[in-house]
Amino acid sequence: MQAYRSWLAQERGLAFDADYQALWHWSVTELDAFWQSIWDYFELQSPTPHTAVLADDRMPGAVWFPGAQVNYARQVLRHADAAHAAGQPALVSHNEQSLAEGRAAAEMSWPELRRQVAALALHLQDQGVGRGDRVAAYLPNVPAAVVALLATASLGAVWSVCAPDMGTDAVLDRFRQIEPKVLIACNGVVYACLLYTSDAADDSLR
């Protein structure tokens, strides 16, 4: 937040200092100025320019940045080379076993993340997934879920995920509403140091 405040002061001549209330008030009353500043601060990229910030402020139905085409995966992975050169990992993760044993967190490098995302994206394309299609995932919070999210987003497809600890009926209710073209699922999870397979859930989802 402080970095953003400093940027506003330097680039926009807006000095909020430590006055969060004033910053908040500006953000909800000067919508165009605030959201354009967010676009610029995070250096969002689009192959086509937006023609306005907020073309229609109806709720629901607001139209933000018409004309722009922003891809989430592209925004994330465009930092890969610089982050890798700086020695920063893309993902840092623990699982229940590594925490219990006091082991160091697992790390995935940016080149490896980019490689896995590209490989899965190609596979999804082979399955007929394209822009606007839905990809559903039945996955825990593991690196594979991040890879699948980015691969899905890179194709312009819609991502939806449910954790394996959700009841099968609840998962089916959610996935039936979106009619996914592809389902990505794990074959088990570890909870309280016990392995639970998802055979029964997999049968229901099929």
PLM-predicted stretches and their roles:
Residues 1-49:
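N-terminal amphipathic, basic-rich helices that act as targeting or association modules
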Residues 196-201:
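Conserved small/polar residues in nucleotide/adenosyl-binding loops
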Residues 22-26, 73, 87-150, 167-172:
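Conserved AMP-binding/adenylate-forming core of the ANL superfamily
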Residues 156:
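Structured binding elements
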Residues 139-140, 160-176, 188-195:
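ATP-dependent adenylate-forming carboxylate-activation enzymes
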Residues 179-180:
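Proline-aspartate-enriched helix->loop->beta-strand connector
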Residues 148-153, 202:
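Short hydrophobic alpha-helical segments of the AMP-binding
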Residues 28, 36-50, 67-92:
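A short N-terminal helical cap/helix-turn-helix that marks the beginning
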